[in-house]
Design a protein with these regions (language model features):
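Short, acidic (Asp/Glu-rich) active-site segment that either coordinates a divalent metal cofactor
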Residues: 1-49
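Glycine-/charge-enriched secondary-structure boundary and capping motifs
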Residues: 53, 58-143
Length: 143
């Protein structure tokens, strides 16, 4: 989460540097993941397919296009429920985390308020909790 947002910050910084001095080329070395997340976002159809394969039917699902906080609010309002969000459980890849720190931005703020990640936020029945735990253990995805 937050990778597209921090990718945008990086691209904007490099654009400003280039506009001030056209002889300096953008420095995007080692930042492929976050740049790609900004320039080529992809919907996570693979997650939907995986959930179907293991027999999980989410009660609610939304893509994270406006930031995690906004999407959590949408699900809570639509279901007339609340939630607890644990900061240490928010999936942040290391490049997003490190680049946010380089920019002096709290990485959690990137995940909560950045957008265009197109990851999926979903809820499942409590009875499917063990299946989700097993799925998490068998994949490198953040669930």
């Amino acid at each position: 989460m937050g990778a597209a947002y921090i990718g945008l910050q990086l691209l904007e910084r490099e654009k400003n540097i280039f506009l001030e001095n056209p002889n300096i080329q953008p420095d995007l070395e080692g930042k492929d993941y976050i740049v790609e997340r900004q320039l080529k976002p992809e919907a996570r159809r693979d997650i939907v397919e995986l959930l179907a394969e293991i027999g999980i039917k989410p009660n609610a699902m939304i893509d994270v296009s406006d930031g995690l906080a906004s999407e959590i609010i949408h699900i809570c309002e639509a279901s007339n429920k609340g939630c607890k969000l644990y900061e240490d459980k928010i999936p942040l890849d290391s490049m997003t985390y490190e680049t946010a720190r380089e920019f002096g931005i709290d990485p959690t703020v990137c995940a909560l308020n950045g957008g265009e990640d197109y990851e999926l936020l979903f809820t499942v029945p409590q009875s499917d909790y063990d299946k989700i735990k097993e799925m998490k253990m068998s994949t490198t995805w953040s669930i």
